[in-house]
């Protein structure tokens, strides 16, 4: 991996940068029953969704455990969402389980490309190609079969969904001199506290443990949906004891998704959480996203990967 790729994330560079989002998928949900069907499956209340906005929500098991995290928005006469590619096939199969009696079509689009664009020049450069792009009031813009999503965290950036053979693609690619590694986007997602749920870590956490309430992706009043009973119980009885965190540090070897994290207490280490995502920033720095047990003194605490003496991490997101 090119080290300059990730170091960029520490500063909002002026220069426009572009990456292919190879580890994300684009799914559409259409049909006359798509609203009611999705409403009974996801944690967000679709009645509140506006056509010019994208939102974050989760799709859960009947027991309330998160199968995947979705970035969802209205698209044509239905809905569309972005999720991690490693979970897409499994998530679609789960979503389709009860669709036999509904007029709904759930499809992973394979004829499209997802691009991530960032940098202070990004808006100006994109306006050379498009009539408009998302702004302060809008986070979704669609033009000529191209969808542009605006992200505000950790700073302004854009996700573009475009068909592989769309002539506009070449115009977009001509804006940059080189293509950056796709993990630059993953690092930005970690820095923005977007929960990264890949296949090998799904069905493990409740939405509250992934900060879905803070992200306005969890509705407890909309009525029945998959996992709602257990999710509501956790909320009203205050049973959640885990929270999402962004940690920075060093480890050799590089940690893996699902690895256990330990916190230092006096002279000993005890287990306190799990890794959701890992990005190597440079030879001396690694970012990880993790779910940790609630503990009042985390700000000054030292963490490590379980039984790895050559690892050292601290919380960055507070």
From Swiss-Prot:
| InterPro entries in UniProt | GcvT/YgfZ_C, tRNA-modifying_YgfZ, YgfZ/GcvT, YgfZ/GcvT_CS, YgfZ_barrel
Any single biological process term in GO: RNA modification
GO CC annotation: what is one?
cytoplasm
The protein's UniProt keywords, in alphabetical order, are: Cytoplasm, Folate-binding, tRNA processing
Gene3D superfamilies reported in the protein's UniProt record: 2.40.30.160, 3.30.70.1630, Aminomethyltransferase beta-barrel domains
According to its UniProt record, where is this protein located? Cytoplasm
- Coarse class of the primary localization is cytoplasm
Q: Where does folate bind?
A: 24, 185
For the keyword Cytoplasm, the answer is yes
Molecular function terms in GO for this entry? Answer: folic acid binding
Function of the protein: Folate-binding protein involved in regulating the level of ATP-DnaA and in the modification of some tRNAs. It is probably a key factor in regulatory networks that act via tRNA modification, such as initiation of chromosomal replication.
UniProt similarity note: Belongs to the tRNA-modifying YgfZ family.
NCBIfam families listed in its UniProt record: PRK09559.1, ygfZ_signature
Name of this protein: tRNA-modifying protein YgfZ
């Amino acid at each position: 991996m090119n080290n300059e790729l990730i170091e960029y994330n520490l500063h909002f560079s002026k220069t426009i940068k572009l990456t292919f989002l190879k580890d994300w998928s684009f799914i559409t949900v259409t049909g006359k029953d798509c609203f009611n069907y999705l409403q009974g499956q996801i944690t967000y209340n679709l009645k509140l969704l506006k056509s010019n906005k994208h939102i974050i929500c989760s799709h859960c098991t009947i027991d309330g455990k998160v199968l995947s995290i979705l970035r969802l928005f209205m698209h044509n006469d239905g809905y569309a969402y972005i999720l991690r590619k490693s979970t897409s096939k499994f998530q679609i199969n789960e979503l389709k389980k009860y669709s036999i009696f509904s007029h709904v079509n759930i499809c992973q689009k394979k004829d499209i490309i997802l691009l991530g664009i960032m940098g202070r020049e990004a808006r100006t450069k994109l306006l050379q190609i498009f009539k408009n792009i998302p702004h302060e009031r809008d986070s979704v813009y669609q033009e000529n079969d191209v969808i542009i999503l605006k992200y505000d965290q950790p700073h302004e950036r854009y996700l573009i969904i475009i068909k592989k053979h769309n002539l506009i693609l070449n115009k977009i690619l001509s804006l940059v001199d080189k293509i950056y590694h796709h993990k630059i986007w993953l690092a930005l997602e970690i820095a923005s506290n977007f929960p990264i749920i890949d296949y090998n870590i799904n069905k493990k956490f409740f939405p509250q443990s992934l900060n879905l309430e803070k992200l306005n992706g969890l509705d407890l009043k909309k009525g029945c949906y998959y996992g709602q009973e257990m999710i509501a119980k956790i909320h009203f009885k205050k049973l959640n004891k885990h929270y999402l965190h962004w940690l920075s540090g060093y480890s050799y070897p590089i940690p893996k998704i699902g690895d256990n994290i330990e916190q230092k207490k006096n002279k000993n280490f005890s287990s306190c959480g799990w890794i959701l995502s890992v990005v190597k920033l440079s030879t001396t720095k690694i970012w990880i996203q993790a779910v940790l047990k609630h503990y009042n003194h985390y700000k000054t605490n030292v963490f490590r990967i379980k039984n790895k003496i050559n690892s050292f991490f601290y919380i960055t997101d507070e």
